[in-house]
Amino acid sequence: MLYSTHGGDRHILKVVLDITLLGPPQINLEGQPLVLRPRNSARAKAILFYLATSGRPESRERLAGLLWSDWPEKKAREYLRGELFLLSGLRQEYLVEVDGRLSLNPQTCRIDLARFCELTEDPHAMAEQLDEALHLWSGTFLEGVESGIEAGAALFVEWLETQRSGWESARRETQYRLAETATHSLDRIDLGIAACTQLLADEPEREEVHRLKMRLLALAGQRTAALKQYDQCTAALLDELGVPPSAETNALYDQIMAGEV
């Protein structure tokens, strides 16, 4: 639920436009999938996805240049006008235009990416916050959104690839932060272990993640599993990088063997 404050009073504002970016993209209007008339255009929805990602007003020139980058400027702007017409039912209340710049109304739109950023921007975020942020993800950023609009939209596809890389890095950083935070919160160790497992499934060569998982398992009283994780680390480093574990990892292994962790 969103709120606004006027004169010290708190007023509830109904969230009616939900936009999902962290996985297969979705737009729901008052709880129902958004269907545009007379044409349920993927490009029109891509405009909303772009604005939801940007989080700031964007010019018509920018939007036309992205989604019709292979077309002459005049034609691109003409196509953009047609797509914006399909979105006319959302204008003012959800889609705002001021001085030729378009943006989404934060008072009436709920965007999972904005919530992810809100939960992770605090450097002292608790494990529960970071876990909530990670549960917003259900796949690749804007998974499959380019289907049907790649033709003539090379710059949009390029932008999409950059965004995917950046937000995937943010997701993995959050997983690592969650695991680190869990070392200081014994009742959240299970969340940290799960985060390490997910990270290593994607990047088995990350030795620091293996160490973190070893420490978490040891703190959880799972000494045998912690030592087994060292073996998995050794195998992964040899397979992926052709190197043995570092002195730091070996020292942690010795500490666990001695019951010092």
Residue ranges and their predicted role:
Residues 249:
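Short conserved active-site loop signatures built around small residues
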Residues 238-246:
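A short glycine-centered flexible hinge/capping loop motif at secondary-structure junctions
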Residues 83, 212, 229:
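Residues within the DNA-recognition helix of helix-turn-helix
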Residues 167, 230-234:
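Amphipathic alpha-helical coiled-coil/heptad-repeat segments
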